[in-house]
Amino acid sequence: MYHDPRSPVSEAFRTLRTNLEFVSPGAPVKSIVTSSPGPGEGKSTVAANLAISLAQTNKRVILVDADLRKSTQHKLFSLPNRVGLTSLLVKDANQDVEQEVAVPGLSVITSGPIPPNPSELLASDVMDTVRDYLAQKADIVIYDTPPMAVVTDAIILGSRMDGTLMVVRLGVTSKEAGKRAKELLKTSRSRVLGVVVNDATHRAGYGSYYYYYYYSDSENENDSAS
């Protein structure tokens, strides 16, 4: 996206960015969890592109790889992964593990070494300290988390943040998996900001890869194309 800002994909993320700004105009969303019902649905790519899009509006953005089982962000941004979120969680919540990237205003905190107890670390009081610390440093923090059908990590973090953005992929995510993920978020009292449908218009032959819609807890859906 950063290398082709005029592409349909870039435009889709700009629309997603705008939609998120209108989710709660009186109380701006400052911490977002991205997840998906299952693996292979593109949640890490969506997290990275959304972070880039937000940074392009002169916001200070931190992208955190909170997938402590199968980390991806260090690969997407070609960064070392010797230290990262796990370093904050097991050592010092205030140490500097942010890495600058080519996008002005955006920094990335990679996962760091994969720990034996990811869920316990993410559910700890130290994670709350890390969240508060990062919130003071950035206008918005995006947390890339594991798929919801695999482990509970996304649910744990979703209940601690301002909202969750769920990513599904057309032709991959089953209706049952999507409903199950939504129920998990509802049970944990996580706020659902919306759903990004990956590959939607691309498969329909229109050249854009993403479609965004928001639904409320009342089950009423208001669709807006990106």
Where are these regions (language model features)?
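P-loop NTP-binding module
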Residues: 1-226
